[in-house]
Amino acid sequence: MAAAKPHMNLAVIGHIDHGKSTTVGRILFETGVVQQHILDGYKKEAESKGKATFEFAWVMDSLKEERERGITIDIAHKKFETPKYNFTVVDCPGHRDFVKNMITGASQADAAIIVVSGTEGPMEQTKEHVFLSKTLGINQIIVAINKMDAVNYSEEKYNEAKDKMTKLIMSVGFKPAETPFIPISAFCGDNIKEASANTPWYKGPTLLAALDLFKMPDMPTDKPLRLPIQDVYTISGVGTVPVGRVETGILKKGQKISFMPANVTGEVKSIEMHHEEFPEALPGDNVGFNVRGIAKNDVRRGDVCGPIENPPTVAEEFTAQVVVLQHPSVLSVGYTPVFHCHTSQTACMFTELNKKLDPRSGQVKEENPAFLKAGDAAICTITPTRPLVIETAKELPQLGRFAVRDMGMTVAAGLVLSVKAKQMR
């Protein structure tokens, strides 16, 4: 059996009508995941509803209500293969709530395709998505300039959209020289799998070929062990078994570990994945591990396991770069929403608004602003209302990102810049 191809999570991001779902549907069709007869069924249904161009999008939007509205709501996971990688597509809705899923889900994307319409170019929302992608740790992107069929495959229109997107991604910190810009028509199939005769002026890779140019993200095995707990079980005859995903470092049998903020220690007796025992677990592995020396009630979801000599950091307070996505009024000092970070959900208070930033350049716009509103980016000091493990995004990005939830929506997202550690006795 050939060794499994490396796996990558791919986010597909874009403004609501720029053809994101259609692009994903087309990729799944061209890679053989979705067969023609299924598509024909979707096509008939789409035509009967007067949405003839939506058949590929319907592959992703398989929920009935979404189909009738023609927009993507929940994140759908679909898998496909290229010669080099196994991809899981995280079809990110052009709606606001995908941010929470992007940060806290297993859907932490390694790379992204940004779909922008050749007829309209980047929109305000495109900026926000690109900025967020960078904020959330996506470092590799492809820009797909879609709907080329609607502009008669005009090189001029392509260049117009490309120039605008070049400026936009540069302002956020992506390097245009390392970013493929590809003219496509997801609906007609141009430059998805085969080079299109309609764009003889374009000499670069097709979309599927460009996906194989992505570099595999580094496995953070050299970092200290950090394993956020999802659940804790008691198994008779075995004992206490915490379950979670290794984010960084290596979990080893026989290792002495500590759980924070619970502040308890134990020793790893055994490690299990898919009902098989393993001597160690690496980043990305979802494991159950039996720990000697702790009882079920000692540890809970949201705790983080680390080596006894380098335990996870419990924050007294932390400073973070925060982007406000949506808020019905304004956000000011004293605001205490719920922060979702790794598996933890903890109410935290904004105790200081230090600097307001220009979201496009990152430059300081205002010192100590009185409030923040939707669309603002800022550096803030935040105090958890109860002990919380959080690390700096620079050292351990997997534990340094968070989503801020309130009133049933994601109001903000951010990255931890520094942590003032709480002394644990």
Swiss-Prot record:
Q: Where is this region: G5?
A: 185-187
**What EC number(s) does the entry state?**
3.6.5.3
Residues given in the record as GTP binding sites:
14-21, 91-95, 146-149
Enumerate the spans annotated as tr-type G domain: 5-221
Region spans: G3 = 91-94
Q: Where in the cell is it found?
A: Cytoplasm
User: Positions of the region G1?
Assistant: 14-21
Among the GO molecular function terms of this UniProt record, one is:
GTP binding
Instruction: Please tell me one Gene Ontology term that the record gives under cellular component.
Output: cytoplasm
Per the record, the coiled-coil ranges are none
In this chain, the stretch annotated as G2 covers 70-74
> What single Pfam family name could you report for this chain, choosing any that match?
GTP_EFTU_D2
What is the similarity comment for this entry? Belongs to the TRAFAC class translation factor GTPase superfamily. Classic translation factor GTPase family. EF-Tu/EF-1A subfamily.
The name this protein carries in UniProt is Elongation factor 1-alpha
Source organism phylogeny: Archaea, Methanobacteriati, Methanobacteriota, Stenosarchaea group, Methanomicrobia
